[in-house]
UniProtKB/Swiss-Prot annotation:
Xref: SMART domains: GIYc
Residue ranges constituting the GIY-YIG domain according to the UniProt record: 42-118
Taxonomic source organism: Bacillus subtilis (strain 168)
PANTHER family hit by this protein: UVRABC SYSTEM PROTEIN C (PTHR30562:SF1), UVRC/OXIDOREDUCTASE (PTHR30562)
Any one of the GO BP annotations: nucleotide-excision repair
Name the record gives this protein: Uncharacterized protein YurQ
InterPro entries: GIY-YIG_endonuc (IPR000305), GIY-YIG_endonuc_sf (IPR035901), GIY-YIG_UvrC_Cho (IPR047296), UCP026568_excinuclease (IPR014527), UvrABC_protein_C (IPR050066)
Amino acid sequence: MIKIDIPAPNVTITERQQSANDNEPKIKPIHGFIDFHQIPRDKGGIFMFYNIHDELLFVGKARKLRQRIKKHFEDTVSPIKHHRDEVYKIEVCVVDDPMEREIYETYIINTQHSKYNIDKVFFK
């Protein structure tokens, strides 16, 4: 069996409310998330959505991480469109090489049995 080391997340954000006494400007939440600014805008990589029980819901890859992740919460064709409210935590790993992104995505989907991925699934 091939052993692939999954990279450690570069960024992890969770649902949170903005405190009234925060010195940061008021941020409009997107499905409970207000920290999208922490996700790199022009970097490629993989991302994982988890629920509050740390169950892997979805794995994806992107050339531009922030844009793609936000799109999952906005568009009507996302595989998680009916499950957006389940997402509690987002982990992001910056991976520059497109081939490596593809390998990591497929590997994570199949070894960690993501709940809502429908493509690249070999474990069902």
